[in-house]
Amino acid sequence: MSKMPKNQNLDIERKQDHIEINLMKNVASTLTSGFESMQFIHNALPEINYDSIDTTSTFLGKSLQAPILISSMTGGTTRAGDINYRLAQAAQKAGIAMGLGSMRVLLTKPDTITTFAVRDVAPDIPLLANIGAVQLNYFVTPKECQYLVDVVKADALILHLNVLQELTQPEGNRNWENLLPKIKELVNYLSVPVIVKEVGYGLSKKVAESLIGVGVKVLDIAGSGGTSWSQVEAYRATNSLQNRIASSFINWGIPTLDSLKMVREVSGDIPIIASGGLKSGIDGAKAIRMGANIFGLAGQFLKAADTSESLLSEEVQLIIEQLKITMLCTGSRTLKDLAKAEIRL
């Protein structure tokens, strides 16, 4: 296992804090995703049967019944394990993709595997392993990353970029130097594609170009408008200075729509996941229209999964129905049609 000089109990406590704060506190960015400024032109005569609306797509070589990702959230604790289990069941039932929360803890506490091992209840979906990119500067090796992929039978590995969150954590990692060459090394080593994901502050055109240049296969832009992780860390702060530093960045980041436009300029055939402040299947449809291949949501799924299986199932179905109704009301039989639907910005 990893040589990371980390306090194992601190990792677990942080994960517990993150779940509790996200469920109980207002941690929304003061920025918006930008999608509220965009409207579809309503088609009053679509000439399409609702039952023929086709939301299917493919991702990582697997079929999706809808272009939706349950974005990475949690793992490592008993409560997180229960949440992941419910999320995986819901993803399998709906035929959508799922990302696991950061798996760094698994490298120092192998017994936490039970909180991430959901493949048995979700055998058919695209399942994404996950670790912070900065950990490549803190003793995590490509071999260990491959282990994380193998142990959960993942279809890809997410490297999340959470620089602002790390810098607003008292125990956060500060060394972000020379990461790109390490990402390239990892891309060339792994048996599965590498996905790079922001965590709520957006990817710029320049960063996207750099990542594509080293072989990253999928980009999750995760722009602002949803959870502000600096605000989460403000609630975790143990003194006034830490709280004030973290709170000052609540309006930081690139709105998701702006990030999507930037990244689409340089992405070519690289799939884009649009996440960050999306609240509905209508927002998801807007993301598809603006160039995303699939869209991700987290917060509403987390709250539903922590409550009950039935509420989570309803939440997933709500998103899908909103997407399908939007497609019909724009005259879009397929996702390709939706990508060309009339809009007003």
Curated annotation (Swiss-Prot):
Record's keyword terms, sorted: Cytoplasm, Flavoprotein, FMN, Isomerase, Isoprene biosynthesis, Magnesium, Metal-binding, NADP
EC class of the enzyme, as a word: isomerase
Sequence positions that bind Mg(2+): E166
Entry annotated with the keyword Chloroplast: no
GO BP field: isoprenoid biosynthetic process
CDD domains xref list: IDI-2_FMN
One Pfam family from the record: FMN_dh
Subcellular location: Cytoplasm
EC number: 5.3.3.2
Cofactor (UniProt): FMN; NADPH; Mg(2+)
Residues the record lists as binding FMN: S71, S72, M73, T74, S102, N130, K197, T227, G277, L278, K279, A298, G299
Positions of substrate binding: R14, K15, S102, M103, R104, Q165
Summary of subunit composition and partner proteins: Homooctamer. Dimer of tetramers.
Its job: Involved in the biosynthesis of isoprenoids. Catalyzes the 1,3-allylic rearrangement of the homoallylic substrate isopentenyl (IPP) to its allylic isomer, dimethylallyl diphosphate (DMAPP).
Family from the record: Belongs to the IPP isomerase type 2 family.
Protein's name according to its UniProt entry: Isopentenyl-diphosphate delta-isomerase
Organism: Rickettsia felis (strain ATCC VR-1525 / URRWXCal2) (Rickettsia azadi)
Gene from which the chain derives: fni
